[in-house]
Amino acid sequence: MEEGKLIHLTLAGIKEAVSKYGTFPMIQPGGFVLEDATFEFNEPATEDQIRKLESHFNVSLPKDYKEFLALHNGLEFLDGIEILSIEDVMKYNETEDLPEKCFLIGYHFDGRYVIDSNRYEKGDLDYLFYLDSIDHFDEAVDLKANFEIWFDRLLSSNGNKYWEVERDVKAYYENIDE
């Protein structure tokens, strides 16, 4: 599949589920059902707004991220995850201490999502990172994903941090009991 197509499919799936069920049905580990997961889609960004963001950071934005912005200039979803609007990306990055050409694009409860456009501009599609609230970029988790694959995986895991899934059977049971 061509880069930038998956984001269209994922967003269409969300909208279909919300339209059909009135919400996005979610099941958390241990069978906990969260029935009122919400999605608040922003209006599309204009081409001028997208160019302004690229100019602001002196970067070429990843194709799939630009596709998302052209469809929805930001999104709040799953009761605690936010993909920032272009205006908020520029605003919130004023206080971030990130390497050149790296910028914050969203939040996951108390963590942050960061694009490393240095990687993208070199042809590497694994450009998305996750930082806990107090982490510095050198402590970031490499999500081994681009924007649309991260978004698809995050939704497939019902908003859980899929990169932190416990693989040890005993520890998995212990985490559910907590």
Tell me the role of every PLM-derived stretch.
Residues M1-D48, L71-E178:
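A C-terminal-region feature
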Residues I50-E54:
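Amphipathic alpha-helical segments within well-ordered protein domains
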Residues D64-L69:
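A glycine-rich, hydrophobic loop/mini-helix early in the fold
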